[in-house]
Amino acid sequence: MAVGKNKRISKGKKGGKKKAADPYAKKDWYDIKAPSVFDIKNVGKTLVTRTQGTKIASEGLKHRVFEVSLADLQKDEDQSFRKIRLRAEDVQGKNVLTNFWGMDFTTDKLRSLVKKWQTLIEAHVDVKTTDSYTLRMFCIAFTKKRPNQQKRTCYAQSSQIRQIRRKMVEIMRNQASSCDLKELVAKFIPESIGREIEKATSSIFPLQNVYIRKVKILKAPKFDIGKLMEVHGDYSEDVGVKLDRPADETVAEAEPEIPGA
């Protein structure tokens, strides 16, 4: 009778159980710095694998995109529906310097704007800033009732919609092409472009909830560290400053006591 191997008897594995490696042991934390156009400069922190051989940590951080709520950047909860995208452009020490890389609305805000008995008007345009950034801007607006209007609906005619859309494109193009990216972002925060569109189109049809709802950067110029530092200003101002102690508060050194004297 042939004696075979009993497969049910489990064979002992070679070596002991491998110790689970800590995934954070080979990683470093870096501070994310927002451009100076925003009130809050310290956005948060990000992880990256430590420099090993030819794989440099700072190279792994560059062009990383972070999405931040404008409410956190401006300390204003009324701006919580705006999402700002920041792209890592350079690494200095443990600081990641970012620049504006787009803007969007939260889904719940967009859904809350759409209502019955009104017309939704949208427009988009590709523009170029003075510092050679090519952006695509999307605008959204809604019609509203005229003063003392009794009728429930406030629908705009097709010809009026076309006129309003032309005005939107014209204003967006003029506003973007006359300034650089930093100045344009400063216009997005208080929604000054939306207010200008609302004012310019009031003679055609009264509008409400006029917003630049989305901004995409299609093309960016060649990286320039000088321009990036202009965007950030002195990013070190958030860090504590060393203070010199006044002369009257300095503690005099005690004279050493001589034993047996």
UniProtKB/Swiss-Prot annotation:
Residues 1-18 have a biased composition (Basic residues). It is found in: Cytoplasm. This is Small ribosomal subunit protein eS1. The keyword Ribosomal protein applies. GO terms for biological process: translation. Its main location: cytoplasm. Keywords: Cytoplasm, Ribonucleoprotein, Ribosomal protein. Residues 1-23 are annotated as: Disordered. One of its GO terms (cellular component) is cytosolic small ribosomal subunit. Component of the small ribosomal subunit. Mature ribosomes consist of a small (40S) and a large (60S) subunit. The 40S subunit contains about 33 different proteins and 1 molecule of RNA (18S). The 60S subunit contains about 49 different proteins and 3 molecules of RNA (25S, 5.8S and 5S). It comes from Nicotiana tabacum (Common tobacco). One of its GO terms (molecular function) is structural constituent of ribosome. Pfam families: Ribosomal_S3Ae. Belongs to the eukaryotic ribosomal protein eS1 family.
